Amino acid sequence: MQSIVPLHGFGGVPYSAVRKAAPKNLLDNSDFTNLVAQAGIGGNHGTTAYAADRWILDSGTVSYEAGVGLTLNGTIRQKLEFPPTGDTSTFVGMASGEASISYADGAVTITSSGGVLKWAALYAGVYTDATMPDYHPKGYGAELAECQRYYVWFDRYLSNGLLTSSATNYYMPISLPVAMRCQPTATSSGWIGRISTGYSKYTGSTKKAFNSLWISDFNGCRLSVCDSISTATDANNINVSFMVYDLEFCADIL
């Protein structure tokens, strides 16, 4: 393999200088022209309003056009799981219009009256116009994986579960796309249905709303969703297939 840069000691530069890493952008979902919004722009994660993943909508409204940016009339905020440890940090962003930016207590806050946000970055340490690194989007896939540490939404999920305790509870294992920050809370405005019997085991309906969700057996990338089923007529401890619609897991830092 041909070396592009001559090795140190042969008239070249030190290898360590070539390999010096660019500073890490500490913000998640920082490219406002290609946003991750699993619950939709301005949607709720649980009971909390979000402009998009990781960006809490503290006040006002937002709208979005892919490739253009996020129009903000209000305030959004991102709380960092691992804030910078030094005394000084540098925030940089790009917007069409005006926006005010602040950083305190491990959170970045952006306020604007109609400005269109393009991107944002937070770096540990002090940078000037001359030393500030160029902004490079991480890419949608990388941003989605980072965001799913804090929030995961399933439009639908098929799983083999267990109906037990006199057919009043079910346990449904779910594999998460990434390890979540902590044991999440599970919420849903959707429903669950039996696959193997065409949902016929649920009295008076082909589908059933969730009753009282809880989580068990959480190990980072896997958990079991549990709920009570008062209308099922199955025997104890049988394996069944469930289809779940509109199920979310929240583990963000508020």
Task: Please state what every model-predicted region is.
Residues 4-254:
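Extracellular and organelle-lumenal recognition/adhesion modules and their flexible linkers in secreted
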